[in-house]
């Protein structure tokens, strides 16, 4: 190393300072993961060099044998990790080691809770592995030179993790990056060959290039020259996905997942598959155990790592899976694609369409298997990713039935409010003669559970699915049936229970409707433009009145979403239904004063709107009418 020039001291980005604080104060009980993170980064740097060297072979000059070396110095209390990958320029070093250049950083920092386990997961999925060096080191030095630049353009970065870092230009003979960790007091155990070897075997055996350590040597006899330093490869150094499934242990699959997903937890499930024939490719797909913080940002980077004939081509290749599977991590290695493939080409290539279709089915099969064989694990999956899976029927018509089978709902079968009922379970419990799947959407579980719309269903013992996620009404607009049974929104249109109503019931309903024609006309006149129709209800057993949605009208949930986003909402008026057996309706029918009849009608209308979760257009008028009624009753 020559003399340092252009030396400057810079401050870390605020978010990095916060992260370093968490690292330095030992966020992790499992400190040895620092080595896994640094090796993972070095592996990525070598992958990038391999890819760039396809079009610029001269980048490999001075060392075509790509590898990672880990060494230590017990006396100096240091651990050094070196790769001969792509390397970094001065600008790269300042950008990558001084800031987090990622969208969603502010959201990420907000999500840090102070709970060590949760925070370690978040930091892992955010991909800030380099900073984990500060778990064991009180000073970190980085020496780097980008491939293709002269030796005089090396860079030296140094920091104690206390808010600032130094960066200087130095001579560096070889391309690539060397990281020197100056271990904290009490962390000397890591300056040991046996310890480092075990950590590499445990966490990084799957890395597809050699990781070398100095060979253990017997001490030189007195007067003898110490033996020349020899290196030995301590990992398997083959791409894990290229090995037969029978030869890969679960622990290896789990560690490989942590490498590709930058996660600190084991995956929930995985699927490893080799396809031969017309198309030839290998896929290794993982479902994480927990949702990333940016799951609901549909434009956030996503996708699989793409390799072509085991050469890394790109991260986050999003063309292989639909958007509703953006939580899936993993690798796809194709023999049919060109090495100079671009994102634009991926979007148009018919080979990709075939692979996407097959990989989508593979993920759905993996989820079906998980739901069937490990329902508790699937419950965890649903809690984390259920709302994203609900985007599926709109995006993926071909797999609509398969996706519908994976959906889970709360229902009137219990009071837990837990989304645990599958459509298959619902149909297995259906009443004899029931040929429909009944559901109700609303803003909250408490609101839908107590909705008057459910009264007739409770009376007849018919289960109703309770849908309260913001996406649910939109979802149901894309689901027309499941297993040949149509979906029916119990708050929409004229409720027809089909075979579940006896002929006597139907006849009685017709007679009551005829008998109440006079009341219907009076209510129409009183409510005027507020309603599209007034009719006798077949839904109610306990409540006096209810508002139903017109068959073609937009539901309340969807209306509220559009209004909140400032979009124009089509005009629609509810249907006012009343329960002729309710004492209040009897009193209303007998009311002689049309003014009082009008006030009572509007009170019933507003109460029905509130019960449906809607807000009143004129709350002051409702309060005025109610107060007037209370005064009359108290006289």
From Swiss-Prot:
Q: Which GO terms describe its cellular component?
A: cytoplasm
Q: Which residue intervals make up region (A)? A: 1-343
Q: Which InterPro entries does the entry mention?
A: HATPase_C_sf, Heat_shock_protein_90_CS, HSP90_C, Hsp90_fam, Hsp90_N, Ribosomal_Su5_D2-typ_SF
Q: Name one GO molecular function term.
A: ATP hydrolysis activity
* Keyword vocabulary terms for this entry: ATP-binding, Chaperone, Cytoplasm, Nucleotide-binding, Stress response
Which Pfam families does this UniProt record tie to the protein? Answer: HATPase_c_3, HSP90
Instruction: Tell me the SUPFAM superfamilies matching this sequence.
Output: ATPase domain of HSP90 chaperone/DNA topoisomerase II/histidine kinase, HSP90 C-terminal domain, Ribosomal protein S5 domain 2-like
Q: Origin, by domain of life?
A: Bacteria
Keyword check for Coiled coil = no
Q: Outline the segment boundaries, as ranges, of region: B.
A: 344-560
Q: Does the keyword ATP-binding apply?
A: yes
Q: Where is this region: C?
A: 561-635
Give the UniProt subcellular location, in the record's own words. Answer: Cytoplasm
| Known partners and oligomeric status | Homodimer.
Q: Return the similarity comment.
A: Belongs to the heat shock protein 90 family.
Q: What does this protein do?
A: Molecular chaperone. Has ATPase activity.
Q: What name appears for this protein in its UniProt entry? A: Chaperone protein HtpG
Taxonomic source organism = Pseudomonas syringae pv. syringae (strain B728a)
The gene that this protein is the product of is htpG
